[in-house]
């Protein structure tokens, strides 16, 4: 309920949002036992404003020099700047904060320099070479300053006069900087245009990693055979392209924040006598000796073209293994820290991808193009440090503990929950006692019940052209993925005054009645609610992601001097149709936004349905 959408989900429609004086009512006051999750959504919508204005700067410059034939020297410089200001304000009528104004100004500057030398040459029109070497330097600087205050005399100035706050909070500032340096080289070789070989190597140095582990070394190579260029393929006129390829390469990830390997201090104030004295204390994140997260990948594929490229097929098989995987790990409170980032082990991904494209019909007045893709990926945790399981993010909304786990031999972030056995003779929820000790223990009575990763994903893109009309649609699908519907647990929180759906009343267990079809426990204060497979649902879906219709005006008939190149009138819609068995609002969810905690739906804001119309003019 901390977000506006969460408040709308959680507040019962039976609650009146205003008191007898016409002021916003704190919905938690209806019952003394009401959950902290319940907030007045109208108050949050009308009496709070949150605005971010971002100015972006993008500058690129390059210099090319060709001293001799085939030799190219290129140096380039790029600057990307982001200047953002966030303003948040809650009015004097807002009942959940004391009339608060927040201002946060963030500035990020990213510069990159690339110096690249390439040399192309051939021998006897048989052997062709392309040699490249270079150096890149990237630097990012981030600065922010935040200030806030509350208890203002008037709402007129909102965040534009923090000095008028009755209570001014201590301002805060933040600074970070990271640097990435790279040396790279590549050789491309072609024999008769049919046999292709590529070899490359790069060395990356990142300031984010520990002192002795800042440099990572990443080789790669690939070979390919253009079978369609062979003389014996001339008799197969329908085959316009056939290319076989295989490759191997390593890449590195810098997906950690700066200074994660250093023992940082945080600041605060404590009361000493009549004064607040500033102090320093260790950060809540324990620093580790971190090294590069590295992914090694094998790839084999084939590219096919038929009927002068009107039909194109691309198929790939890949195997990826990521070692020294970086992940946040919770620490026991006795350590004095809450968490740490650690190289926890290795995971693998292997799968196949298929892409089929076709220009089915192409003539003056009518055209039909189709594109279909399907992909299967299998994810597996190969190894963990000391072989120990790692639990995912802890939720405390309705149950207790975490919902996901990282375990050797299982998918990353698999659902790790209790096994629901239905309702007992008293109408209460019951669970399977896995180890038979008569108690429910987090570590011994839970099991892996599902995975948020799909068996396969697929998509269909269709484009139809008739004279000056264009019609396009894109279908997107996911099959076999599970969703943990944490929002559904709200329907079991009987004793907290939460918004509970009408079906609970009709489908709940009742004393003295036939309860063979009861789906919900007896309506009372439920004390045995746990994260169980009861809340795991099939998250498969097929979605009409985009559909559009456009008309191109025949400008060539009345723009005689070619000053007008085109006028296009269009209407398009996004996410207007979704077919799914998932009972929640949207099956395409991830409350925490990471692979370790993917597929958890907790009052998640759904994908927006949009309808847009416009005119595009080209001169």
Describe the predicted segments one by one.
Residues 207-212:
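Solvent-exposed loop/turn segments connecting transmembrane beta-strands
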Residues 1-56, 74-181, 229-297, 308, ...:
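Surface-exposed loop/interface segments of Gram-negative outer-membrane beta-barrel transport/assembly proteins
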Residues 546-579:
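C-terminal structured "cap/appendage" subdomains that terminate the fold
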Residues 65-67, 79, 121, 137, ...:
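Short beta-strand segments enriched in hydrophobic/aromatic residues
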Residues 451-484:
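Glycine-rich, aromatic-lined ligand/substrate-binding cores of catalytic
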Residues 182, 216-218:
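Transmembrane beta-barrel architecture of outer membranes
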Residues 61-65, 115-119, 133, 185-189, ...:
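Residues on the lipid-exposed face of transmembrane beta-strands in outer-membrane beta-barrel proteins
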Residues 197-206:
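Transmembrane beta-strand segments that form the barrel wall of outer-membrane beta-barrel proteins
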């Amino acid at each position: 309920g901390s977000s506006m959408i969460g408040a709308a989900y959680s507040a019962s429609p039976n609650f009146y949002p205003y008191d007898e004086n016409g002021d916003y009512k704190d919905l938690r006051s209806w019952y003394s036992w009401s959950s902290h999750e319940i907030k007045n959504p109208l108050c949050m919508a009308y009496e709070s404003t949150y605005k971010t204005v971002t100015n972006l700067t993008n500058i690129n410059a390059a210099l090319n020099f060709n001293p001799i034939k085939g030799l190219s020297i290129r140096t380039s410089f790029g600057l990307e700047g982001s200047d953002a200001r966030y303003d948040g304000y809650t009015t004097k009528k807002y009942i959940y904060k004391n009339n608060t104004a927040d201002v946060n100004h963030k500035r990020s500057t990213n510069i990159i320099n690339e110096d690249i030398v390439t040399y192309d040459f051939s021998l006897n029109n048989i052997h062709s070479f392309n040699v490249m070497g270079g150096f890149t330097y990237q630097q990012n600087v981030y600065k922010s300053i935040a200030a806030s205050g509350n208890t203002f005399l008037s709402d007129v100035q909102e965040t534009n006069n923090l000095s008028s706050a009755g209570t001014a909070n201590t301002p805060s500032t933040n600074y970070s900087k990271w640097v990435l340096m790279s040396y790279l080289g590549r050789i491309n070789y072609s024999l008769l245009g049919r046999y292709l070989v590529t070899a490359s190597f790069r060395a990356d140095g990142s300031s984010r990693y520990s002192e002795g582990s800042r440099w990572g070394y990443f080789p790669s190579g690939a070979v390919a055979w253009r079978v369609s260029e062979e003389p014996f393929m001339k008799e197969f006129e329908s085959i316009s392209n056939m290319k076989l390829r295989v490759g191997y390469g390593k890449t590195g990830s810098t997906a950690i924040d700066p200074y994660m390997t250093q023992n940082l201090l945080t600041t605060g104030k404590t009361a000493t006598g009549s004064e607040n004295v500033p102090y320093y204390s260790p950060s809540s994140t324990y620093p580790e000796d971190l090294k590069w997260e590295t992914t090694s990948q094998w790839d084999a594929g084939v590219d096919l073209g038929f009927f002068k490229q009107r039909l194109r097929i691309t198929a790939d098989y890949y195997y990826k293994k990521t070692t020294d995987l970086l992940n946040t790990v919770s620490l026991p409170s006795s350590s004095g820290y809450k968490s740490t980032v650690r190289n926890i082990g290795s995971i693998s991904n292997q799968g196949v991808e298929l892409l089929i494209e076709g220009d089915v019909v192409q003539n003056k007045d009518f055209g039909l193009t189709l594109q279909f893709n399907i992909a299967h990926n299998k994810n597996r945790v190969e190894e963990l440090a000391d072989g120990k399981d790692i639990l995912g993010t802890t939720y405390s909304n309705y149950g207790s503990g975490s919902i996901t786990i990282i375990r050797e031999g299982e998918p990353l972030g698999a659902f790790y929950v209790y096994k629901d056995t239905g309702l007992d003779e008293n109408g209460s929820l019951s669970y399977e006692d896995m180890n038979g000790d008569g108690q429910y223990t987090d570590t011994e009575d839970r099991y892996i019940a599902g995975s948020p990763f799909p068996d396969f994903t697929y998509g269909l893109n269709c484009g139809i052209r008739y004279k000056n009309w264009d019609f396009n649609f894109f279908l997107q699908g996911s099959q076999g993925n599970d969703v943990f519907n944490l929002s559904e647990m709200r329907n079991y929180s009987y004793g907290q005054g939460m918004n509970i759906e009408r079906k609970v009343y009709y489908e709940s267990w009742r004393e003295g009645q036939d309860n063979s079809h009861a789906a919900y426990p007896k309506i009372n204060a439920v004390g045995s609610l746990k994260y169980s497979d009861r809340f795991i649902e099939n998250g498969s879906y097929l979605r009409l992601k985009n559909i559009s219709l456009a008309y191109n005006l025949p400008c060539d008939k009345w723009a005689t001097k070619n000053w007008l190149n085109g006028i296009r009138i269009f209407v398009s819609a996004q996410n207007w149709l979704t077919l799914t068995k998932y009972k929640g609002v949207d099956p395409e969810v991830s409350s925490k936004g990471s692979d370790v905690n993917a597929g958890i739906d907790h009052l998640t804001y759904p994908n927006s349905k949009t309808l847009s119309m416009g005119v595009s003019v080209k001169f």
